[in-house]
Amino acid sequence: MATVVAAAFVVGGLLVAGSTPPARRSSPVTVPIRGVRVYLDVSGRSPDHPGETHLTFDGNPRTSWWTDAYLGPDKAHFGGLYDGEGLAIHLARSARLQRLTVMSSTRGWAASTYVSTHGVAMSAPLADWGQMVSSRRNLQGSASFDLRGRSGDWVLLWLTDLGPAGLANVAELQIRASA
């Protein structure tokens, strides 16, 4: 009798094992970056180091783009000259975006993120980027931002606080999206 019960369990297990498994959620994939530009919502001002933005996606964490160094009592907030400066990240394709990872050695920095389905003029008002997606403060080096599944092919990393040193760097950017 025990042999018959054991055989029933084995046969039952084989039937379950042969059935279609439940669908798995696919892992996020890295979306290639086509280019990065410095974004300012203040016309008439020169962006900080626009020729070095390619260093944010060159695969080398020892190279980076830097803001200018700001001085004075409000140096963490761009010397009181304006509200922020950003990196407009143009992706190789539109996707449902999950996460932006920023490699940085800056201490005490803050930033917000925006996602767009179209390019925005580099001196257009910040409102042209649409609704803010996420925001983080008092970051101690590298950080990740939740892009909440928003669809787009442009991401803006909008720096709002440079930390106590009065300057910030971005060594590498990576964007992950739904497969």
Question: Can you describe what each PLM-predicted range is?
Answer:
Residues 126-138:
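Solvent-exposed serine/threonine-rich low-complexity stretches and specific carbohydrate-binding patches
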Residues 33-36, 132-133, 158:
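Generic hydrophobic, helix-prone segments enriched in Leu/Val/Ile
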Residues 1-23:
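Hydrophobic single-pass membrane-targeting/anchoring helices
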Residues 4, 49-52, 107:
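Generic signature of intrinsically disordered, low-complexity, basic-rich segments
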Residues 17-92:
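Disordered, acidic Ser/Thr/Pro-rich linker "stalks" and the adjacent N-terminal cap
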Residues 60-126, 144-179:
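Aromatic, loop-rich ligand-recognition surfaces of beta-strand-rich domains
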Residues 141:
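Aromatic sugar-binding surface patches on proteins
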